[in-house]
Amino acid sequence: EGILTSATLMTNTPGFEHAVKLSKENPDLGVGVHLVLTFLKPLRDDVPSLVDENGNFYRPDAYRSGLAIVDSDELYKEWDTQIQKALDAGIEPTHLDSHHHAHTFNERHFDVFVKLSEKYDLPIRGNAEYDHSRTTTTYFEPAFDGVGLLEKKEQEVYLDTLFNRIKENDATEIMCHTGYIDEFLIKSSSFTDPRIYQVDILTDSKFVEKIRNDKDIELVTFRDL
């Protein structure tokens, strides 16, 4: 059902086991590892440069302000542990990316990210800021998160424009944040209602029909690129 083909998994969250179960129930879904540096706690306890006085990851603002400066070796160890946890759970990752695009905060983070992608021979996404030669698609659509908040006519215009972009490019990635609202999401994220709207648009809409009925459009995962 729907046209979503790829997801990405955070290994340090309470929903990890549930996500692994869903992945195994949907073997055609591409699943990447969503490397975490800015949410909850690390998996390791020997990475002091990554955490605040409470043992939590620093938030993104700490990196923007210069308060948080990670040790590259510690970041490598933590992200490597996150990837290994996914592998140990039976996940065969299709790609690497990161929460809050943490791998693009600076070149130090990006270098660690690239080293891990090479170690595990995995594509990387969300990296055009530093290395265009490593991009995985020819077009990246960053504005889909707001589609559910548009008025009906504006939404139709946006989706028609997006469809044309898909037709014009060899490979298109539409970044989305689909989901259902529960207590944990409400407490941990300010991005809630738009997730439900995205589910509807990606499963039951004229946009879905147009994508499915176009013989020139193929739905793929990062494994296919």
Regions found by a protein language model. Give the residues of each.
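Structural preference for beta-strand elements that scaffold enzyme active sites
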Residues: 4-8, 28-34, 93-97, 123, ...
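Aromatic-lined glycan-binding groove of carbohydrate-active enzymes
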Residues: 121-123, 128-130, 160-161, 165-182, ...
